[in-house]
Amino acid sequence: MAYAVDVARPLVPEALELLSDAVLNPKFEAWEVEAAAQRLAADAAAMKEGNPQGGLLEALHEVAYTGALARPLLAPTEVLSRLAPEALSRFVAENFAPPRVVLAAAGVGHSELVNLAAPLLESSSSSSSSSSSASPVRAPESKYVGGDCRQFSASGVTHLMLGFEAAGGWRDVPGSVAVTVLQFLLGGGGSFSAGGPGKGMHSRLYSRVLAKHGWVRTCAAFSSLYNDTGLVGVYAAADSSNAAQLVDVVSEELRELASKPVPAAELERAKAAALSSVLMNLESRAVVAEDIGRQVLTYGTRKPVSEFVDAIKALTPASMCAAVKKATATPLSMAALGDIAALPRYSEVAARFK
């Protein structure tokens, strides 16, 4: 979780005091908790009805992992109905203790930030330890296992996700960089785009799937990376009459990437797009501050940008092929929504990657 504030430089002391007080000393009113629970229930219903990709990604995590990563991002209705101020206060006491908090900033000097933050965090630490007997929670564990989840829908459209483990997650810098570049290499999107080359029209899923198979509505790469693990794969949608063909097409694209190196020109284009994305994002101070915080939580320090740039530049067609082969050697995770009767069995799809 992240809390942020954006202010003019002279107002940093006041903003920091407000931010630390809101994060570390929150007050939960019963009516506020009830209103928030109602909004979350509405968000969950909206995702179910209008965001099949988001719903499938939730389902994919549920079958791909055991442990914390298998739990839904949007709380089930039965959990929301039991939500109370006391539960939220206990959660904050256990998880928002200063030893587990990273304060990151951009546009302010490090020494100045430390001098401003130290008394605020020390005060909160002493007050929280005296007012709460809760012990800090251990980092949750998750294990990748793979699996299958299918939900019937009479919408006439079948949505599909095929995913594999990106073992090592963010802490495996070469591996996470390969996943990032792979997402640009595969690219994809919807069957209609008003864009041009800058919109990824030369990516593999556009040129090899969407441009060749008019019945495919959507085909795009996805990735969800965490500290020590992650998911990488392809999301696609088509008319239900083409559901079985959709599995064939997506499977073949992933198998080909794992079996032979991509042309050097394609990889260089994907690497250039990844480099551009990384460097352009870091032009924003808000992104820089978030990046510092995330890296300190993940690596214990902030790595220089050059380390990621060098890792991207070092990728070769052979190393990209090896990275995809490593991922597709893990158990398949598959999620589908639509005419599931027309889809091949999980064991048949998984066997294609053996």
Residue ranges and their predicted role:
Residues 43, 60, 174-187:
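Active/ligand-binding-proximal structured segments within catalytic/core domains
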Residues 201:
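Basic, alpha-helical interaction scaffolds
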